[in-house]
């Protein structure tokens, strides 16, 4: 019997003593049938190298606050508990354990970070914990029965960037700069697969650490390669630093980056150097008139007025909304609120609109929730769609996880 099962047993025993004979007794931790409240939680980098990622968590919290204010999810209120992990994978595991054993969460929801979420997988499997909407992109998520990721594998996104560069912009000399962790390695896998299928060799491939602030040597390698374009997969601080290094060296490059850097916070870091950068994005533009995106803008302005309205927030909102969609489907099914039934409800989600994402689908054995991306471009402090949504390049999307 694992720790989670022991917690379920002790919780059910306590409730039975208080409410003998009640048909509403919970057999899952994090479920309060009397108050009709579900407790979920996540880890987030309030400290460490990327504290601005807390914007993601604020937006997820704004989603739950907004839902609760409107009567909850099918009448159930959500208590959302978040703890700082400093963007340190070792701490993330400890935080996940604390959330289960001390805060008694029903599911891990919208936890932030690729490497951090990957590190938490063994504990989540051991403890029977569902991970819904991990805010990171890695192939490790897609075959796990207890994980429902909304974000794509960054390899698919890197392949989408390369596809647009080659097929639409007719570029051939492309360099990749990639964060030396699971985020960047995932991007590199997809990029390499697409380039190989296109019979075009990358002119350079340069790893960097997430804490890198000076990209001078990295950009020197890119410039010396004769690259026409550079695809960077790292944080918005990394992108801004790379753009500044390129500017200092007068390196003329067409830049590409992942969706989460298409955010007002990146303009604050990079200024007008960001203009012209392309971004692959599984999310609708933040200024979309779609009701779910409008709801995000209104809620984050209400609950976190100091936060910018941007893709970081829409990302967090959408991952929280994924839990809302799956939990709502579980309630509609009429089945007991258990972890197993939550997984079953998730596996039945088909072509769903979830926050700023569309056509989200999960089936048993295939948890690749997001299946298409658009291309955005930075223009004058905004992000404009320059190519509509299309499926990910099959060579990356259908590749077996490494």
Predicted regions and their residues:
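Extracellular/periplasmic periplasmic-binding protein-like sensory domains
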Residues: 243-317, 389-400
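Extracellular/periplasmic Venus flytrap/periplasmic-binding protein
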Residues: 94, 139-140, 145-250, 286-294
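N-terminal export signals
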Residues: 5-25
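Immediate post-signal peptide segment of exported/extracytoplasmic ligand-binding proteins
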Residues: 26-40, 73-77, 166-172
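Beta-alpha junction/loop-to-helix N-cap segments that form part of ligand/metal-binding clefts
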Residues: 27-29, 52-58, 70-141, 208-215, ...
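Extracytoplasmic "Venus flytrap"
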Residues: 30-34, 41-60, 83-90, 112-115, ...
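Venus flytrap/periplasmic-binding-protein-like
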Residues: 85, 132-133, 138-139, 210-211, ...
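Segments of small-molecule ligand-sensing domains
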Residues: 302-313, 324-386
């Amino acid at each position: 019997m694992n720790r989670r099962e022991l917690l379920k047993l002790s919780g059910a025993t306590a409730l039975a003593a208080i409410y003998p004979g009640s048909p509403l007794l919970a057999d899952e931790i994090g479920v309060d049938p009397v108050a009709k409240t579900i407790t979920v939680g996540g880890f987030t980098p309030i400290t460490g190298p990327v504290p601005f990622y807390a914007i993601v968590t604020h937006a997820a919290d704004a989603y739950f606050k907004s839902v609760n204010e409107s009567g909850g999810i099918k009448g159930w209120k959500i208590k959302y508990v978040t703890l700082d992990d400093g963007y340190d994978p070792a701490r993330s595991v400890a935080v996940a354990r604390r959330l289960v054993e001390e805060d008694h969460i029903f599911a891990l929801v919208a936890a932030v970070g690729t490497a951090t979420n990957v590190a938490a997988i063994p504990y989540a499997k051991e403890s029977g914990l569902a991970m819904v909407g991990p805010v990171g992109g890695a192939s490790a998520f897609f075959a796990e029965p207890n994980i429902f990721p909304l974000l794509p594998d960054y390899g698919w996104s890197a392949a989408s960037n390369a596809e647009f560069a080659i097929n639409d912009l007719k570029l051939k000399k492309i360099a990749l700069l990639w964060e030396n962790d699971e985020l960047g390695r995932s991007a590199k896998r997809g990029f390499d697969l697409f380039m190989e299928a296109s019979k075009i060799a990358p002119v350079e491939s340069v790893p960097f650490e997430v804490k890198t602030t000076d990209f001078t040597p990295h950009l020197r390698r890119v410039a010396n390669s004769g690259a026409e374009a550079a695809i960077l997969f790292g944080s918005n601080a990394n992108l801004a630093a790379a753009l500044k290094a390129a500017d200092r060296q007068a390196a003329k490059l067409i830049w590409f980056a992942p969706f989460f850097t298409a955010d007002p916070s990146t303009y604050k870091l990079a200024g007008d150097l960001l203009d012209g950068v392309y971004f692959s994005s599984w999310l609708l533009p933040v200024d979309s008139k779609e009701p779910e995106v409008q709801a995000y803008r209104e809620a984050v302005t209400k609950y976190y007025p100091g936060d910018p309205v941007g893709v970081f927030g829409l990302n967090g909102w959408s991952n929280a909304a994924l839990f809302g969609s799956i939990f709502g489907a579980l309630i509609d099914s009429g089945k007991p609120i258990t972890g197993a039934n939550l997984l079953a409800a998730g596996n039945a989600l088909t072509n769903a609109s979830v926050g700023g994402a569309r056509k989200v689908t999960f089936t048993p054995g295939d948890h690749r929730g997001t299946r298409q991306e658009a291309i955005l471009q930075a223009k004058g402090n905004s992000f404009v769609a320059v190519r509509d949504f299309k499926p990910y390049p099959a060579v990356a999307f259908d590749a077996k996880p490494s």
